């Protein structure tokens, strides 16, 4: 999958892409990241990509021309869906990541300053995405999060596709507690069931622990979750089923 990232600060993106899973994914050919410096498309000798807003006001606005030229250039190759990372976009979730993972390529536009000339958005943007109700100094960190979250869904990137299936938010459940060596840490022991070797018992324990964690920390997620017959039986055994049904009936 190809990720095109438009930015005026390409160095902000390079280091995270050269470490860990994202580096391996690029080396294996699972993903390709094309960082595009918007300044290269500026028309003046100072490579200016921003100007004062019409109507006055504080700050600067990113100019439409360099952005449009950059997108036009990418479209000659493979731009895919052009996405503007902005607080006004639709909320980014695991479902959106899975949706984007179906694309062969996407282009992420990183805004800066007070925003981007609206005319560029009207003519060139296909989608707008927001990571949440907070403000960043630019879209670069958001772009990296999108690249990371989409890449790990792609076949072979994690090396274990089951890791993707069992991730938090692959269902509307938080992940169960995790433990590793030593068996006892500051008086706290690893639950016995995890040392039993009984795979079904371990799976059941983790499922219940996941539901309990979600119920206490993010109960709203359970309103959308659907359980199969066996899971419902387990929930009833642990006095959780009626609580979840009551939660789902609130709306």
Swiss-Prot record:
GO CC term, one of those recorded: cytosol
Pfam family, one: tRNA_m1G_MT
Reactions catalysed according to its record: guanosine(37) in tRNA + S-adenosyl-L-methionine = N(1)-methylguanosine(37) in tRNA + S-adenosyl-L-homocysteine + H(+)
Binding site for S-adenosyl-L-methionine: 111, 131-136
Any Gene Ontology biological process: tRNA N1-guanine methylation
Family: Belongs to the RNA methyltransferase TrmD family.
PANTHER family on file: TRNA (GUANINE-N(1)-)-METHYLTRANSFERASE
Name assigned to this protein: tRNA (guanine-N(1)-)-methyltransferase
């Amino acid at each position: 999958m190809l990720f095109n990232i438009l930015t005026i600060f390409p160095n902000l993106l390079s280091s995270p892409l050269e470490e860990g899973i994202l580096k391996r994914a690029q080396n294996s050919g699972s993903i390709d990241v094309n960082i595009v410096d918007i300044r290269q498309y500026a028309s003046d000798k100072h490579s200016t990509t921003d100007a004062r807003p019409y109507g006055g006001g504080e700050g600067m606005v990113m100019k439409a021309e360099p952005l449009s030229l950059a997108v036009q250039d990418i479209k000659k190759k493979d731009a895919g869906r052009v996405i503007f990372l902005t607080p006004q976009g639709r909320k980014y979730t695991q479902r959106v990541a899975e949706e984007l993972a179906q694309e062969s390529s996407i282009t992420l536009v990183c805004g800066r300053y007070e925003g981007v000339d609206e005319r560029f958005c009207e003519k060139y943007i296909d989608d707008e995405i927001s990571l949440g109700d907070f403000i960043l100094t630019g879209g670069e960190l958001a772009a990296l999060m999108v690249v990371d979250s989409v890449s790990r869904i792609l076949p072979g990137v994690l090396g274990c596709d089951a890791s993707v299936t069992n991730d938090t938010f692959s269902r509307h459940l938080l992940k169960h507690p995790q433990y590793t060596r030593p068996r006892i840490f500051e008086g706290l022991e690893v639950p016995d069931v995890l040392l039993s070797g009984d795979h079904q018992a371990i799976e059941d324990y983790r499922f219940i622990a996941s539901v309990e964690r979600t119920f206490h920390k993010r109960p709203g997620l359970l309103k959308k979750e659907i359980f199969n017959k066996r899971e419902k039986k387990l929930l009833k055994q642990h006095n959780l089923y009626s609580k979840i049904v009551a939660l789902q009936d609130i709306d």
